[in-house]
From Swiss-Prot:
This is Vascular endothelial growth factor A. It holds the Pfam family VEGF_C. It is found in: Secreted. Homodimer; disulfide-linked. Also found as heterodimer with PGF. Interacts with NRP1. Interacts with BSG. Its main location: secreted. It comes from the Eukaryota. One of its GO terms (molecular function) is heparin binding. Disulfide bonds join C25-C67, C56-C101, C60-C103.
Length: 164
């Protein structure tokens, strides 16, 4: 049977350039705990409890550099949200994926280079910021809020009750 890409036969030697290319800084699928992305939603149990996301990972081959995202986008996934003793429903949740990664100077140096102020002092997890333009956008989507009979507040990025 033909082998899947990346699959190795037992005791096969992997060539240096293959090892180097596959270990260098790049977007790679990682399993991310939903509570890491939504730390305030402790009243729910999520099924699944983690999701596969493309995130930057790998080596930069220089101690002063780190692998960081240079392009990101949101992806919406259907997740079961369970509220113990109250019920469950499948709803949409938005997650950040990395589409491009680069080796950049580590945070101490990057902090002076980063002219962007934070999107919000409180509830930082509700916002996504473009590192190039400093533009802030909401992780929540209008359709996600509407599915819960709520509307997206663009200023706070929260789903609020519609005003009458």
């Amino acid at each position: 049977a033909p082998m899947a890409e990346g699959e190795q036969k037992p005791r096969e030697e992997v060539k240096f350039m293959d090892v180097y290319k596959r270990s260098y800084c790049r977007p790679i699928e990682m399993l991310v705990d939903i509570f890491q992305e939504y730390p305030d939603e402790i009243e729910y149990i999520f099924k699944p409890s983690c999701v596969p996301l493309m995130r930057c990972g790998g080596c930069c081959n220089d101690e002063s550099l780190e692998c960081v995202p240079t392009e990101e986008f949101n992806i919406t996934m259907q997740i079961m949200r369970i509220k113990p003793h109250q019920g469950q429903h499948i709803g949409e949740m938005s997650f950040l994926q990395h589409s491009k990664c680069e080796c950049r100077p580590k945070k101490e140096k990057a902090r002076q280079e980063n002219p962007c102020g934070p999107c919000s002092e409180r509830r930082k997890h509700l916002f996504v910021q473009d590192p190039q333009t400093c533009k802030c956008s909401c992780r929540n989507t209008d359709s996600r809020c509407k599915a819960r009979q709520l509307e997206l507040n663009e200023r706070t990025c929260r789903c609020d009750k519609p005003r009458r």
